[in-house]
């Protein structure tokens, strides 16, 4: 009878320890990660473009920033790029900047993509995916609309039409009431 009781107590203690360990791991992986949402400060980052020029998000304060995460293999991303290029021609002079963050690909692959799509805006490389993780991005494409004060005013997941891109750039241009 004593052996059964000891076994029962040991099993109970083991279950409590396993639950505590599981809870600790869950908190470390998921609960500690703050999701970037509307109204949040946009996390600063420094990344290089395909020519090695450093771009820091905080240097763009005072401008609206259309922060787009993408990949060369992503079909919806390919669809958006010509629309983004068209709208950039119009909105750049109004204080809106596009920063397209390529996720985990080589300089050569990104450079070739840029040439074939006639990209006219800054494209930076997040080879180690640190910025992707900081912004908690999933899936691609995901776009963060950042107002001139550095606040995220909208997060858009999935493909955008040219009309949507136009409206979003209007939303974040300096002088507009964007959150």
Curated annotation (Swiss-Prot):
Keywords, comma-separated and alphabetical: Cell membrane, Cytochrome c-type biogenesis, Disulfide bond, Membrane, Oxidoreductase, Redox-active center, Signal-anchor, Transmembrane, Transmembrane helix
Pathway(s) served: Protein modification; cytochrome c assembly
Record membrane topology: Single-pass type II membrane protein
Membrane-crossing residue ranges in chain numbering: 11-30
Protein name from the UniProt record: Thiol-disulfide oxidoreductase ResA
Organism: Bacillus subtilis (strain 168)
Compartment annotation: Cell membrane
Family: Belongs to the thioredoxin family. ResA subfamily.
Disulphide-bonded residues: 74-77
PROSITE patterns named in the record: THIOREDOXIN_1, THIOREDOXIN_2
Function text: Thiol-disulfide oxidoreductase which is required in disulfide reduction during c-type cytochrome synthesis. May accept reducing equivalents from CcdA, leading to breakage of disulfide bonds in apocytochrome c; following this reduction heme can be covalently attached. Does not play a role in sporulation.
GO cellular component terms given for this protein: plasma membrane
Residue intervals of the Thioredoxin domain: 36-174
Taxonomic placement: Bacteria, Bacillati, Bacillota, Bacilli, Bacillales
Pfam families registered for this protein in UniProt: AhpC-TSA (PF00578)
GO biological process, one term: cytochrome complex assembly
Molecular functions (GO terms): antioxidant activity; disulfide oxidoreductase activity
Source superkingdom: Bacteria
Principal cellular location given in the protein's record: membrane
NCBIfam families with a match to the protein in the record: PRK03147.1
């Amino acid at each position: 009878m004593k052996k059964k009781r000891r076994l029962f107590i040991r099993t109970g203690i083991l279950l409590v320890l396993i639950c505590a360990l599981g809870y600790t791991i869950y908190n470390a992986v998921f609960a500690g990660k703050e999701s970037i949402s509307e109204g949040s400060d946009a996390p600063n980052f420094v990344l290089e473009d395909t020519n090695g020029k450093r771009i820091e998000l905080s240097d763009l304060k005072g401008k609206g920033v259309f922060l787009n995460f993408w990949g060369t293999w992503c079909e919806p991303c390919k669809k958006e790029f010509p629309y983004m290029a068209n709208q950039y021609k119009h909105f750049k002079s109004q204080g809106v900047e596009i920063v397209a963050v390529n996720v985990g690909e080589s300089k050569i692959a990104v450079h070739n993509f840029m040439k074939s799509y006639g990209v006219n805006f800054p494209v930076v490389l997040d080879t180690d995916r640190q910025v992707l993780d900081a912004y908690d991005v999933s899936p691609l494409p995901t776009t963060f609309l950042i107002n001139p004060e550095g606040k995220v005013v909208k997060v858009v997941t999935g493909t955008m039409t040219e009309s949507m891109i136009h409206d979003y750039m209007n939303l974040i241009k300096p002088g507009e009431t964007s959150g």
